Swiss-Prot record:
Residues 1-23 are annotated as: 4 X 6 AA tandem repeats of V-V-T-G-S-C. The lineage of its organism: Eukaryota, Sar, Alveolata, Apicomplexa, Aconoidasida. Residues 53-101, 191-235 have a biased composition (Low complexity). Residues 53-310 are annotated as: Disordered. Residues 176-190, 236-263 have a biased composition (Polar residues). Pfam families: Cementoin, CRAM_rpt. The keyword Repeat applies. Residues 103-114, 147-160, 264-273 have a biased composition (Basic and acidic residues). This is 300 kDa antigen AG231. The keyword Ligase does not apply. InterPro entries: CRAM_rpt, Trappin_transglut-bd_rpt. Keywords: Malaria, Merozoite, Repeat. It comes from Plasmodium falciparum (isolate FC27 / Papua New Guinea).
Length: 310
């Protein structure tokens, strides 16, 4: 309602915005309703159409650029690593088997006394400890699965050590006979090389060949297993027969010639009865060790030995 018209009394403004009543003048104020056209100013809300600007997010389609990852097919170029098969040339290390000869050279200078019994028992303990540590390394192709025979051999070695110590104690109390025939010692001293030399040589071969770690070539190809076709190269592990060169350790037979030198020194020895007993115990222990070594399945690659389960 505008102008000089004053709404008083029973004057009622209806929806059609027509002033009626005592004013006398009926005036359509509908022209003012058009002022409400400002409400459509809310059309600015569709300005939110800028939100579709998020279409830039599909720019992440660059992620498929990771197709370059199959470029890792160059990793099979590591097949040159099998050139490390030349490492078994280190089988010349068994030449160090001559070092145990120094042990016998010192024994040759000894005379049959009570000191021989103690020294031989200490040597037997040291050789057992060395062979025990080397046996732990001998299962380098079993992928972490321990050999059950090791536990049995440990239990068998304990009473043998105690028996050697008891014999040493008993022999201290008994008088020693320095006139024992040299021929009797020849048969005994022939067993000494088996006790001191042969077990270390066979185990040194297995220990020295551990650095070949042919497993590294396998583990490096495992990341390439994302390319299933590349896994077809895993049969390249046919290089395992190449390890058949390990039997080239027939040089151990050369080590058997060493007892010939020990016999020459043995003819010069004059030992006590204690030597015969302690040496026989050492020979028994070496036989047990060589028996457990035969069971070492170095090409089974983690597959347990069925005889172990039995």
């Amino acid at each position: 309602v505008t102008g000089s018209c004053v709404v008083t009394g029973s004057c009622v403004v209806t929806d059609s915005c027509v002033v009626t009543g005592s004013c006398g003048n009926t005036r359509t104020v509908t022209t003012q309703e058009s002022v409400t056209t400002q409400e459509p100013v809310t059309i600015e809300e569709p300005v939110t159409t800028q939100e579709p600007v998020t279409i830039e997010e599909p720019v992440t389609t660059q992620e498929p650029v990771t197709i370059e990852e199959p470029v890792t097919t160059q990793e099979p170029v590591t097949t040159q690593e099998p050139v490390t098969t030349q490492e078994p040339v280190t089988t010349q290390e068994p030449v160090t088997t001559q070092e145990p000869v120094t042990v016998e050279e010192h024994i040759d200078e000894k005379k049959g006394s009570e000191g021989d019994n103690i020294s031989l028992s200490s040597l037997s303990e040291e050789t057992e400890e060395k062979s025990h540590t080397k046996k732990k390394k001998s299962s380098w192709l079993k992928f972490g699965r321990g050999n059950k025979n090791d536990k049995k051999s440990k239990n068998e070695k304990k009473p043998s050590l105690e028996s050697v110590k008891q014999n040493a104690d008993e022999q201290k109390e008994q008088p020693t006979d320095s006139q024992i025939s040299v021929n009797a010692q020849d048969s005994v001293t022939i067993q000494e090389p088996t006790a001191t030399q042969e077990p270390p040589t066979t185990q040194e071969l297995t220990a020295t060949q551990e650095p070949t770690t042919t497993q590294e070539t396998v583990t490096e190809q495992e990341p390439t297993t994302t390319q299933e076709t590349v896994t077809a190269q895993e049969p390249i592990t046919t290089q395992e027969p190449v390890t058949a060169q390990e039997p080239v350790t027939t040089q151990e037979l050369i080590a058997t010639q060493e007892p010939s030198t020990t016999q020459e020194h043995a003819d010069e020895k004059k030992a006590s009865e204690g030597d015969n007993i302690s040496l026989s115990r050492l020979s028994e222990e070496t036989e047990e060790k060589s028996h457990t070594k035969k069971k070492s399945s170095w090409l089974k690659f983690g597959r347990g030995n069925k005889n172990d389960k039995k």
